[in-house]
Amino acid sequence: MSEPELQLVARRIRSFPDFPVQGVLFRDISPLLKDPVSFRASIHLLASHLKSTHSGKIDYIAGLDSRGFLFGPSLAQELGVGCVLIRKRGKLPGPTLSASYALEYGKAELEIQKDALEPGQRVVIVDDLLATGGTMCAACELLNQLRAEVVECVSLVELTSLKGRERLGPIPYFSLLQYE
C-alpha cells in the first residue's frame, strides 16, 4: 500500500466531537469527496488491495446505501467489474429480498433486487465506514439469500472500538483507516 496515498486520504478525514449526539466523535469524509486527487487515491488503494488479494476473481462490487454508493461505482470501474446496489427498504423497483438489522433505537431493513446476481457470483461489499457492523452483516445476509459468494467487505474507515469486524465472522474485512 502506498504510504503517501494513504496519508493523503487520512488528511481528508475530519473529526467532529459530539455529533450527531453527545459522546460521539463523527468521522466526516466530505473533504475527501471534494478533492479529486484524494478520492482517486482512496479508490486506487482499495482496488490495489482487492487486486492483490483476489487476483481478478471478483464479479461485482455491492455498494451500500447511501455512502457506499459514493465508492462502489468508482471501485467497480477501477476493477473492470459491475456494481450492484443494496438499498434501504422501499427504494428499489421490482421483486426484492430484504434483511433486517438493529439500530440504536429500533431496526432497519436493506433490500436487493432478486435478479441482481446469479448464484456463485463473487461479490465485494463496500461502504464508507464500518462501526457496529449491523449494515454490513445485513448486506452479507442478502447476498447469501441470492447464493452469491461474499469474498470480502471493505470500507474507507473502521471504528475499531465498536468491533464491527468481529460481527462479520469468517468474512474477510479490510479498511484503509482505523480509528478508536
Swiss-Prot record:
The modification N-acetylserine is found at S2. Coiled coil: none annotated. It is found in: Cytoplasm. Catalyzes a salvage reaction resulting in the formation of AMP, that is energically less costly than de novo synthesis. GO terms for molecular function: adenine binding; adenine phosphoribosyltransferase activity; AMP binding. Disulfide bonds: none annotated. It comes from the Eukaryota. The modification Phosphothreonine is found at T135. Its main location: cytoplasm. InterPro entries: Ade_phspho_trans, PRibTrfase_dom, PRTase-like, UPRTase/APRTase. Gene3D superfamilies: 3.40.50.2020. Keywords: Acetylation, Cytoplasm, Glycosyltransferase, Phosphoprotein, Purine salvage, Transferase. GO terms for biological process: adenine salvage; AMP salvage; purine ribonucleoside salvage. It comes from Stochomys longicaudatus. The modification N6-acetyllysine is found at K114. Signal peptide: none annotated. The gene is APRT. This is Adenine phosphoribosyltransferase.
